[in-house]
Design a protein with these regions (language model features):
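A short SAM/SAH-binding and catalytic strip from SAM-dependent methyltransferases
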Residues: 117-132
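A short glycine-rich, Lys/Arg-flanked "PGG" loop and its adjoining helix->strand segment in the class I
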Residues: 134-146
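Conserved alpha-helix/loop element of class I SAM-dependent methyltransferases that forms part
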Residues: 30-48
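C-terminal alpha-helical "lid/dimerization" subdomain adjacent to the S-adenosyl-L-methionine
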Residues: 155-210
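A short acidic, Gly/Pro-enriched loop at the edge of an enzyme's catalytic core
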Residues: 109-119
């Protein structure tokens, strides 16, 4: 289905952010390494020549992880930040996998309309506003082959749950590792509630089902980062 451009959070992924993105996130390497390890496992039984859609591909981390493990796979990566794509293209070229990749500037609507064995979207969905989240998931669903896989990780949590204050303190510790300022830490609650489109796990799973996926299966959690996988029904 054709959807209007999603309402996203303000674009902070400029050239300065793109150049510093991987360095800034290196403090979270244990989390990202585990996430990518599990990503490779949950997609391990795809065809040897699988075609993978990477939504919000950024600097190409998931392509680098999957391309090394599965040398017959090809990738289409889409991202609204030209600066992030430029960094990603350079990394993929250095890793000698760029010839297996097509990188597109834009949103999921700008990706080829069908034929993917799997779609991957890591730490992207929470940048999509609540009112556009179903359309986002539906666009991904419609680009998969019947039975195709969707794997996603996003910031997710019930912000009104009694345990949320404790969850927030843990999340602040993550932000400190990434260089957060005292001012940004003080605003973190508001950022999660208003600047980002953070949904509860139950809301996310319900939207996946509404988009046409089978039952979402949780496969990853690190504080407020949660990952699910499901198949197109």
């Amino acid at each position: 289905m054709q959807q209007s451009r999603p309402a996203t959070t303000p674009n902070v992924f400029n050239r300065e952010m793109a150049d510093a993105y991987d360095r800034r996130n290196s403090a979270l390497a244990p989390i990202s390494d585990c996430l990518h390890f599990l990503l490779r496992l949950v997609l391990a039984d795809l065809p040897a020549s699988a075609r993978i859609l990477c939504v919000g591909v950024g600097t190409g981390a998931e392509i680098l992880s999957l391309a090394k493990a599965y040398p017959g796979w090809s990738f289409v990566g889409v991202d609204p930040s030209e600066d992030m794509l430029a960094v990603g293209r350079s990394r993929l070229e250095q890793a000698d996998v760029l010839e297996r990749c097509q990188l597109l500037h834009g949103y999921v609507q700008d990706a080829p309309s069908e034929g993917f064995d799997a779609a991957v979207s890591l730490l992207v969905a929470h940048f999509i506003k609540r009112e556009d989240r179903l359309a986002f998931y539906s666009e991904i669903h419609d680009r998969l082959k019947p039975g195709g896989r969707f794997v996603s990780a996003e910031i997710s949590g019930d912000l009104d749950a009694p345990e949320f204050p404790d969850m927030l303190e843990d999340w602040k510790r993550i932000q400190v590792l990434m260089g957060a300022t005292p001012e940004s830490l003080n605003k973190l609650d508001s950022t999660l509630r208003h600047a980002l489109g953070v949904l509860s796990p139950a809301e996310t799973e319900a939207l996946w089902r509404s988009a046409g996926f089978g039952k979402p299966i949780p496969f990853f959690q690190a504080f407020m980062i949660r990952g699910w996988r499901a198949s197109r029904t």
